Amino acid sequence: MDSQPAVSCICLTYGRPQVLEEAIHSFLLQDYAGRKELIVLNDYAGQTLIFDHPEVRVINCPQRFRTVGEKMNVAVALAAHDLLFVWDDDDIYLPHRLRFSVEHYDPQKGFFKPAQAWLLNQGALQGPLGNLFHVGSCWSRRLFDGVRGYPAEGTGYDLIFEERLAKQFPGSAKPYAIRPEEIYYIYRWGGTGSYHMSQFGHYKPGQNVGHNQVETFVQQRAKRGEIRQGAIPLQPCWQTDYRQLVASYLATVAD
């Protein structure tokens, strides 16, 4: 009997299959022995994403969700399991993420997130650095339901979610003091050719910051022929050996 919990990974995407393919590959490389699934929720109507794999469900919506917070809630509702991992479509997760997180996850607490991550900017690795890094977290459906999910917001939806957790379940959202050699999350900034919702402004209650700007960014690139349209068979792969990149950086820091 498998004693390891089944996990669902939530991956939202909008108009950037080239980075999504790397995120899916990150999932496929996971060394976790328990059952797992990746839910890819796409609401860019110009693309129908196609990928056939028993552990990956790609869901294409013909209409865009009003906010990314509501999109997250829908993805969680579609998840088969009750331990949920946020899986950003433009970042990298090393193969030990699921295993390491489950090993350090306390079901009574219901939340796990490391305090630090690597930063990859224009191909150069930096860090470790601390930030919110909600997309490196996992949590139980019990906690999610306890705060009624994510707020109907754009930029800042993740911050508000964790603030609600901290208020409703004191101590739950405290991050884990991870060692450099244990870090599994690589936050990518410049160099992907894509957008960051956070670059369009800070959280303002009720303003859905970043929503329209992301849509405009994608529309403009599509008009220039820089974003593929129609049916897109996904071909997951990494553009760089990120395991080796981190290993080399750690060796340099140790010296």
Predicted regions and their residues:
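Glycine-rich, basic loop-to-helix element that forms the pyrophosphate-binding segment
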Residues: 62-79
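Short beta-strand-to-loop element that shapes/binds the nucleotide-sugar donor at the catalytic cleft/hinge
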Residues: 112-126
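A conserved acidic beta->alpha catalytic loop
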Residues: 40-50, 88, 92
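Cell-envelope/extracellular polymer assembly enzymes that use nucleotide-activated donors
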Residues: 5-8, 37, 160
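C-terminal catalytic/acceptor-binding lobe
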Residues: 153-155, 159-255
